[in-house]
Design a protein with these regions (language model features):
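A short helix-turn-beta junction within AAA+ P-loop NTPase domains corresponding to the substrate/partner-engaging
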Residues: 505-509, 719-732
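Post-Walker A helix-loop "phosphate-sensing" segment adjacent to the P-loop in P-loop NTPases
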Residues: 479-489
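Conserved lysine of the Walker
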Residues: 469
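Hydrophobic anchor at the beta1->P-loop junction of P-loop NTPases
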Residues: 461
Length: 800
């Protein structure tokens, strides 16, 4: 029998010496570590972030993040606030125990130098550079006194467990779509973030000075770096109990101890009002409904057992058994109420962790910021407590990754969680060719809009005398002039715009019975209408003109309309056959074409035109002799008098329409500011024509703005619905009580919103853009050149 040789691998190893064991242990400690992070990257607790936005936290845990914008909540109608609250409850009830939700609210300072540069208007080397510099200074001053360059962003991170990345992706996508649906029902703009966006947010938290984020996915492989290397701070230090170091700055994480019997829906908003760098996080973990009910029932049973023990003790001691410790009675009632809510109402139970992260340049500033945040908590009978020796875990839990390492939790029902409403006021801050429209009075953020991007850029400016209506128009004119190449036209019934137009080297056309400036109301160009023949729209204008001339409450009769239309076709026949200036008709041609019909109705219209053809008001019976070549043109119609003013406004509107049709082919927008706009809406035919032009402006690249102080006259027009439906931009300044009531009903303004147009200061009010209603303030400093050329106050105008 052969002997089996034992392989060398299985031979009993030699016993290690004590010195060898010590050496090996040292090597293992060096390379294995003690579990504590040794680098800033190691503190960031995720394994990978993928380009589609999925974050792998560990082998079985994955998260995605939604960025959502603010909506107007605090100033909304009560029924709107209730609806938003109910939709929030629905969102939380959608989340089951397998989904962890983290709401993050970040107030982040951007690079002040770069931020200020974004509002600079570059010099052009012309006569307006001093105005550009002054206007830029005004914007930057408003920026400094407003939000101090703080950008406020909101995120919802949802975390799940899954066996692998493929399964996680499918479920996260489905959950993301469902959550977006809930945001949509609240009227909130939201989107699921991709990986680059998530990394940029992390970088912003770790670099609070606003250092720009530089990263591309194709940089990873050649560099051998991970995504953490691009977002991590230069250093993290957790050497003290209640603060930590963050790349040369100081930070502290606190938790909210909820002590109040009732919570306010303004509490979260007040935390976010602070102008310091702050990051507020709410970790919300749903408890399985069946398990929650069982737990509460067990608690009630325990409380009942304690009650029985207390009653037995009372009987033995010889006093009333109904006298129980107050805490025991209170806890028992609260537990039964909670059970009733879970069983009979649409309520669920959640565990909430509320964290506040403050970051500052110095320890003293950090202490002040934390004290300020603690004051907000105290206001609502809660307490903000610094985390002791858990600052690293607090920082990790404050990152929008969906990780909560702080187990200081408070059980709350659905409605209690939803009371932390994440909305205050919607912002209007568009990029690109946006212009400045003031400061959001609620959030102190700048309002930057591009009206040309709106569905209907047409606008209205309404306010009492002295409310800043003209200043608002002039401020917008300056913005358009300095930041675009668009044409600007002004209908100026009170000669208020002359100083501004003169300083901007614009053209003033003065129309009056004694003026030598003439504008032919019958001017037409071949692009006048979308139709093959431009006569249809021009005929509407002539009908409106004749209606104003003839007067009367009933307007033109059917036969009168017919004879006018027939005359219009006749007088334009030569011009359409040979479109040269010599063939352009004037009013006397229309007058003669009416007489040539030999009809009593035609004669009646011709007689009404006599005053404007051969009488003392024949200022409009001439060919146009002004070259409207300037990009800024003001029509001064102050001296036309009451009889001619409406005609003048109608003719100006028609002239500007002609310019709009010409500019359309060149891709240039045409802005039109019409003061005393209500005058065009009194007569039926004129109102109908103006409403039609109002609608056409939008399609042809026009941006009209009607301004008036006579709100009742404006709103009494039969065409006001068409005007309002085609106006996505409305500025409401101070209003008289009657007008305020009418506007509030027509525009569905809440009581809180109405306060901003009641005895408001000049330049303050409400701005309505599409579906957003914002309180705003847009004062122009009096010690500026701009103010002096824009003011309408007599004492200040004289100083010019």
């Amino acid at each position: 029998m052969s002997r089996k040789t034992i392989p060398r691998e299985t031979e009993k190893p030699k016993k290690l010496t004590r010195a060898q064991k010590k050496e090996i242990d040292a090597v293992l400690r060096k390379y294995k570590g003690d579990g504590k992070p040794r680098t800033a990257q190691a503190t960031i607790p995720y394994e990978a972030i993928y380009p589609d936005g999925v974050c792998r936290i560990d082998r079985r845990t994955f998260s995605k993040c939604i960025a959502f914008e603010d909506i107007s909540y605090q100033l909304a109608q009560p029924e709107t606030r209730t609806a938003i609250f109910e939709h929030l409850c629905d969102l939380y009830n959608y989340v089951d125990a397998s989904i962890h939700v983290q709401l993050s609210f970040l107030n982040r300072k951007v690079d002040p130098v770069q931020y200020a540069k974004s509002f600079e208007i570059a010099p052009q080397g012309d006569d307006f550079d001093d105005i550009r510099a002054e206007y830029t200074a005004i914007l930057q001053k408003q920026l400094a006194s407003g939000n101090n360059g703080i950008v406020k962003t909101k995120y919802l991170t949802f975390t799940i467990e899954a066996d692998n990345l493929k399964t996680a992706r499918a479920r996260l996508t489905r959950i993301g779509l469902d959550l977006l649906g809930y945001f949509k029902t609240m009227g909130c703009v939201a989107h699921v973030m991709d990986g680059q966006e998530r990394l940029e947010v992390l970088h912003g938290i770790f670099h609070p000075d606003g250092e720009p984020f530089r990263f591309e996915w194709d940089w990873l492989a050649p560099s051998g770096l991970s995504t953490k290397d691009f977002v991590a701070p230069s250093s993290l230090c957790f050497g003290t109990a209640k603060t930590f170091g963050l790349g040369g700055k100081y930070g502290a994480v606190s938790f909210l101890q909820i002590l109040a019997p009732e919570l306010s829906d303004e509490m979260l908003a007040d935390f976010l009002k602070t102008e310091s760098g702050i990051l507020v996080n709410l970790h919300v973990q749903a408890i399985d409904q069946t398990e929650a009910i069982k737990t509460i029932k067990r608690k009630i049973t325990d409380l009942d057992a304690m009650k029985i023990q207390e009653q037995k003790k009372a009987v033995r001691s010889g006093y009333d058994m109904d006298i129980l410790p107050s805490d025991l009675a209170t806890y028992g009632e609260d537990a039964k109420k909670l059970l009733n809510k879970l069983q009979t109402r649409n309520e669920r139970l959640f565990m909430l962790t509320f964290l506040v992260l403050n970051v500052a340049d110095t320890k003293q500033k950090l202490g002040n910021d934390v004290f300020q945040a603690a004051g907000v908590a105290q206001k609502y009978n809660c307490s903000l407590v610094r985390l002791d020796y858990q600052q690293e875990q607090g920082l990790v839990s404050s990152l929008p990754l969906g990780i909560n390492q702080i187990k200081i939790q408070r059980s709350l029902t659905t409605s209690n969680v939803a009371v932390f409403v994440p909305f205050v006021t919607q912002e209007l801050f568009q990029s690109g060719a946006a212009m400045y429209y003031g400061i959001n009075a609620k959030s102190h953020n700048m309002i930057m809009l591009d009206r040309k991007q709106a569905r209907c850029p047409n606008g209205l400016k309404l306010g009492t005398p002295g409310s800043g209506k003209s200043m608002s128009c002039k401020s917008e004119i300056v913005s358009v002039f300095l930041t675009t190449a668009d044409d600007i036209f002004i209908s100026d019934p009170e000669a208020e715009y002359y100083p501004l137009v003169k300083r901007l080297h614009g053209q003033v056309i003065k129309l009056s019975p004694t003026s030598k400036d003439y504008v032919n109301p019958l001017d037409i160009n071949l692009n006048y209408s979308e139709d093959d023949s431009p006569l249809a729209l021009k005929s509407d204008f002539v009908l409106s003109f004749c209606e104003l001339v003839m007067g009367g409450k009933t307007g033109l009769e059917a036969i009168e309309r017919t004879v006018i239309d027939r005359a219009v076709k006749a007088i334009y026949r030569p011009y359409l056959a040979n479109p040269c200036p010599e063939n352009m008709p004037i009013l006397s041609d229309l007058h003669q074409a009416l007489l040539d019909q030999h009809l009593p109705e035609a004669d009646r219209v011709a007689q009404a035109l006599d005053l404007y053809v051969s009488g003392s008001l024949n200022v409009f019976n001439h060919k146009t002799n002004v070259d409207i070549h300037n990009r800024l043109v003001s029509f001064d119609i102050k001296e036309l008098g009451k009889q001619l003013k409406k005609l003048g406004m109608l003719i100006i509107q028609d002239q500007i329409w002609g310019r709009v049709t010409q500019n359309r082919s060149q891709g240039r927008a045409t802005w039109y500011f019409a003061d005393e706009f209500h005058l065009l809406l009194k007569e039926e035919q004129t109102a109908a024509y103006s409403a039609e032009i109002w609608k056409r402006f939008r399609k042809w690249g026009g941006v009209p703005t009607g301004a008036t102080q006579n709100v009742k006259d404006l709103l009494s027009s039969p065409e006001i619905e068409n005007i309002l439906e085609n106006s996505d931009f409305i500025t409401l300044l101070n209003q008289a009580s009657g007008d305020r009531k009418i506007l509030s009903e027509r525009l569905n303004l809440s009581a809180d919103q109405q306060k901003y147009i009641d005895n408001s200061e000049p330049g303050e009010g409400l701005l309505i853009f599409e579906n957003v209603v914002l309180p705003f303030s847009n004062p122009i400093p009096k010690n500026t050149q701009l103010y002096k050329i824009m003011t309408t106050r007599l004492s200040e105008v004289v100083e010019l």
